[in-house]
Amino acid sequence: MRQFIPMRRVLAVATLGALFWAAPASWAAAPPEAASCIACHGAGGMGNPAAGYPRLAGLPEQYLADQLRYFADGARNNAVMSGMAKPLSAAQVTALATYYSKLKPSGKPAPMPTGAAAAEGERLALRGDWEKGIPACIRCHGPGAVGVGENFPALVGQSAAYIEAQIKAWKDGSRSGDPLGLMHTVALRMTDAQTQAVAQWLAAQPLSPTKSASAKH
């Protein structure tokens, strides 16, 4: 007698197979816990821009470990990530952070915005708005916004949706853990229009800094 296999199971197996073949060569070295990360953050750790899931690949190891701890203890308020992070042991947190920090980021930036919003985004990222006490993004996140040290991660390679959501989270207090409360203070001074403009401009920048994206006018 021929056994009937539910279509749901067939689709599940096909999906897992596709994820396996899409995984980078380094996936063989991934800790077991990373299997739970791939659905949202992708096989290469570059996230899902359409859904607002962030890039993890190439971010500092200590930064990644800190974020998992913040999700676990509530410093970052996200129901899904809190549920993922709370059961992790210290060794598992370290293993995940180490693995994703060693992945090489890849991919193309989002399309460059146009018009007044693009000009405003560039101004905020490269020069800031000192009349409102808003420093340029590159002051802390480095030339090209590629990140500096363990506390100031790369902004390039992240989607506009994610960057905008995080600025709003700093603003409303649902995210904390920033050095000296710096991001909370900056976010409070930004309008929604400024938040959207700088997020869209940063998302359109290349992973490697260019002269225009690194200039401190």
UniProtKB/Swiss-Prot annotation:
Matching Gene3D superfamilies: Cytochrome c-like domain (1.10.760.10)
Keywords: Heme, Iron, Metal-binding, Repeat, Signal
Keyword set includes Cell inner membrane: no
Sequence ranges assigned to domain Cytochrome c in this UniProt record: 29-104, 116-206
Amino-acid biosynthesis listed as a keyword: no
A GO-annotated cellular component: periplasmic space
Residues annotated to bind heme c 1: C37, C40, H41
PTM summary: Binds 2 heme c groups covalently per subunit.
Binding, heme c 2: C137, C140, H141
Highest taxon listed in the record's lineage: Bacteria
GO molecular function: electron transfer activity; heme binding; iron ion binding
PROSITE patterns, sorted: CYTC
Biological function: Acts as an electron acceptor for the thiosulfate dehydrogenase TsdA.
Name of protein: Thiosulfate dehydrogenase electron acceptor
Organism: Thiomonas intermedia (strain K12)
Gene name, Swiss-Prot/TrEMBL: tsdB
